Amino acid sequence: MRVKDTLNLGKTKFPMRGNLPKREAEWEKNWEDQKFYERRLKLNEGHERFDLHDGPPFANGNIHMGHALNKITKDIIVRSKNMEGYYAPYVPGWDTHGLPIEQQLTKQGVDRKTMDRAAYRELCRKFAMEQVEKQRTDFKRLGVMGDWDHPYITLLPEFEAAEIRVFGKMYENGYIYQGKKPVYWSWSSESTLAEAEVEYHDVESPSIYISFPVKDGKGKLSEENTYFLIWTTTPWTIPSNQGIAVNPKFDYSVVEVGDRRYVVGTDRLSAVAEILGWDSYKTVQHLKGTDMEYMVAKHPYIEGRDSLLMEAVYVTDDDGTGLVHTASGFGEDDYNTAMRYGFDVLSPMDNKGCFTEEIPDPDLVGKFYTDTNEIVKDKLSAAGNLLHYSTFVHSAAHDWRTKKPVVYRATTQWFASISKFRDQILDQIEKTTFYPAWGKTRLYNMIKDRGDWVISRQRAWGVPLPIFYAEDGTAIVTHETIEHVADLFAKEGSNAWFTHPVEELLPEGFTSEHSPNGKFTKETDILDVWFDSGSSWSGVQALGRAVHYPTSMYLEGSDQYRGWFNSSLITSVATNGVAPYKSVLSQGFTLDGQGRKMSKSLGNTIAPNDVIKQMGAEIIRLWVASVDASGDVGVSMDILRQVSEGYRKIRNTFRYMLANTADFDPEKDRVAYKDLRKIDQYLEVKLNDLVAESIVNYDKYDFADVYKLVFKFITNDLSAFYLDFAKDVLYIEGKDSHARRSMQTVIYDAAVKLAKILAPILPHTMGEVWGYLKEKEEDVYLSNFPEIEDYADADDLKESWGEFMKLRDDVLKALEEARDQKLIGKSFEASVTVYPGEAAKAALDKLAGEDFREILIVSNLVMGQGEVPAEAKQFDQASVLVRRAEGEVCPRCRMYRTDLGADSRLPQLCGRCASIVAGDHPEILEEGLED
């Protein structure tokens, strides 16, 4: 037998390389075949619930890194909650109605305007379901576990029926009404938009100053050559002007410039004078805003049209002139002010953004709104009322799908009246927990300031508004009509609205005093898609999915404060008086490595599927766990490669632990905590602290800290310390020796507990690790998080070993200096004498009996007494003297020893090794030992 054959060298089939792109798919198939998701829930039946309700991604195309961040975060939460013992189901969902589906069909050459509506909607449904299947495959490949065979999908009949009932309950409670008021209008989509469907981009717009001649100053202001001065960026709205708003609290000045007089906000006077080039002007009169109410101005270029002066507190002195041009059909503030003063709504624009015959200037009829800016400018100039024209760049509202500008346009729509139950919504926000905490203020302010919600859309693909109209135009919505439509939708889906005549959509024998002839028509608009997803708390119940209401958590990107968090809150409070969620967790956006938004034009997008093919889903999952996703997070191939280095460190550490516990049977070889060596007890205590802190961080949804704690423990406590000196015990000591079994107990515990703690983050790899451990559960996911132990001596151990670690730092510094001086090479070539200070000596006394030589990996260690030699190095905790070790290297333990050949039967070994080999391999005494 050779010397190396007497060593307890670790062996394992756990591969160094994960080969993740290939093997992950095999593990995922095994999860599904073995029904681990269902079995985990079965284990937790009857336990406290944790329901994370999935915000439905839109079913359109393969997933991107934002999807990966979101879905993996949810999976980490659900897995960790289940491993904590909660009953935590996960039901994935999809949002499947809306304009993007219609746009995709248009790209395929489908023209909805030439098709039967029901047939067109069937094409939409088919396309949407194809996208669901595509994304389902993508999400599962990320290692996301859930009830993938029974998702909730907004186009499913039972879901649509539930949505109809939500609408009906809101109508019954008095929260739904029809009105004509300005809403975001997308001429490119020919539909209204919700606030959540609007995004902002920089555009170049006109900036013009216009004078309105005073017609009636109410005895307070001269009409002769006197003008109200306004500023606007939308010349195309000037023909529809109905009034001028002034702030009742502001001071206004009448200034003389040449032969004209202008009324301007006093605080804006100097800025306006500079812009208009008034080198000299004279203030001739002061007015209060309240003085000007009900004064009348002439339209700046249309004969016979007047403009009423009205009070409005929203008028600011931040820009403009302090007087605001008002057109009721093209602005929410304009509308509200005009209504207070008894005006009819004037909105002379069609669905495509072109002016209708209602426009007071016939020259503009049929023209696209922005094309009229130059015409209006020229007419103002000809009338002598254009004082200044320039352009400027500013942020303007755009359709989030078409990327085209949108306008405020007054149209007849259906609304949810937020103002009627705003206080209830705000009260529910106060009762909700937010991660991060600032989310509460953000959502609160959004609800506090938001207007009523326009819920009707002029599109084809969506859930129809379940409204009928009588012969006299009266809208009909009753409990009976809602239930009849909902029951029909539950059986046939919402296409029934378009395949059945109105008589079959109404309850049998339905009559109304508003239809003496029994004739009815049905609404052609559909519900806003945000009403679809906003009703998901109800739809998922109607589908019989395992999600309780109110649910434990909603988790989505921070854009959903004005989207899904918002719409879900409104529908739930409106129908049931409670928020649909107990907590809300929001995430930032995924940016590239330089902090830029990802876009195809910049070429900086990363597809999760491409990363999976190159590196594996585990690397994406570890990236998700490593970042603080409460804000925006960067991702690039370079960043992912750095993450993969961290993964490699974790994997290699597990490989070492598995190899060196391969001959350890926890049932018979385990050493009880009280019998462990003190250094091993210390590591058990450190491991226990790690488990406790990790679970706390899981409960705070702070996965970045879980990862940091684990990685720090693996790197510092294990690799750089415990496992570094472990070889001297694991390889050298007797196979069944107390020292070796004591250390193996700790290493095995570390492998088990770290596998459990990392399982929610790295389920593929930790499942693989689990297969090499001797635990009763078939998979790590079927186990629970480690129990947190109560070690009575934990604080004393941490204090004593903490002092020793400071002493160790001093010794390592001394060894490094000796290495620099070429006195030694490796640390085992050294003989070290330590003269400890008081704190270190006290710690060493408490740790009496420990083999500090072994821990410091030196051949000889002496605790010096008496006077410190001059050549010793002075450090914080001790003085350290390093000399080259005497003797020869033992070929087995690699330490310098002076007792080689002490046992004549094994002359090449030191006394320690000879004793161990004789005990473990007595046959060698007969056969002899080769080098």
Curated annotation (Swiss-Prot):
Catalytic activity: tRNA(Ile) + L-isoleucine + ATP = L-isoleucyl-tRNA(Ile) + AMP + diphosphate
Amino-acid positions noted as binding Zn(2+) in the UniProt annotation, renumbered to this chain: C890, C893, C910, C913
Binding site for L-isoleucyl-5'-AMP: E556
Binding positions for ATP per the UniProt entry: K600
Cofactor(s) in the UniProt record: Zn(2+)
Top-level taxon of origin: Bacteria
Domain statement: IleRS has two distinct active sites: one for aminoacylation and one for editing. The misactivated valine is translocated from the active site to the editing site, which sterically excludes the correctly activated isoleucine. The single editing site contains two valyl binding pockets, one specific for each substrate (Val-AMP or Val-tRNA(Ile)).
Protein name per its UniProtKB record: Isoleucine--tRNA ligase
Record lineage: Bacteria, Bacillati, Bacillota, Bacilli, Lactobacillales
